């Protein structure tokens, strides 16, 4: 049952983020949208942060208020719920090294790091 609850939470969070970003894109404050859909701004915040689950009826009101079809809130949901790959410790380290390398501004320093890695890679264990 825990996995199902995780999926439900991810869906609630996905929809909440869509509400939040669309509200901001439309230039509406939380208070303004809350008044249109007849809830408090605190309740709207709970929907946006997936603290409270939103009913379909309320989601329809939000879609109308934000001039969107209700389908908008579900677009991309399937992709968002795909399990993320689990990285091994080695893969995480490679990602970290790559990210840190990209932060080096100097071409000379990047070349020095590259030469060091080549040297270490050529060593026999």
UniProtKB/Swiss-Prot annotation:
Residues 19-73 form the HTH cro/C1-type domain. Gene3D superfamilies: lambda repressor-like DNA-binding domains. It holds the Pfam family HTH_3. Keywords: DNA-binding, Transcription, Transcription regulation. InterPro entries: Cro/C1-type_HTH (IPR001387), Lambda_DNA-bd_dom_sf (IPR010982). CDD domains: HTH_XRE (cd00093). GO terms for molecular function: DNA binding. This is Uncharacterized HTH-type transcriptional regulator RC0668. It comes from Rickettsia conorii (strain ATCC VR-613 / Malish 7). The lineage of its organism: Bacteria, Pseudomonadati, Pseudomonadota, Alphaproteobacteria, Rickettsiales.
């Amino acid at each position: 049952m825990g996995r199902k609850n995780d999926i439900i939470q991810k869906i609630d969070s996905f929809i909440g983020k869509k509400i939040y970003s669309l509200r901001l894109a439309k230039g509406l404050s939380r208070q303004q949208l809350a008044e249109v859909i007849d809830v408090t701004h605190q309740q709207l915040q709970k929907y946006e942060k997936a603290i409270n689950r939103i009913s379909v009826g309320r989601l329809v009101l939000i879609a109308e208020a934000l001039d969107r079809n209700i389908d908008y809130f579900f677009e991309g949901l399937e992709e968002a719920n795909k399990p993320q790959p689990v990285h091994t410790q080695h893969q995480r380290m490679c990602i970290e090294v790559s990210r840190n390398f990209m932060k080096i501004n100097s071409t000379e320093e990047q070349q020095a790091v590259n030469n060091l890695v080549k040297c270490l890679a050529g060593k026999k264990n």
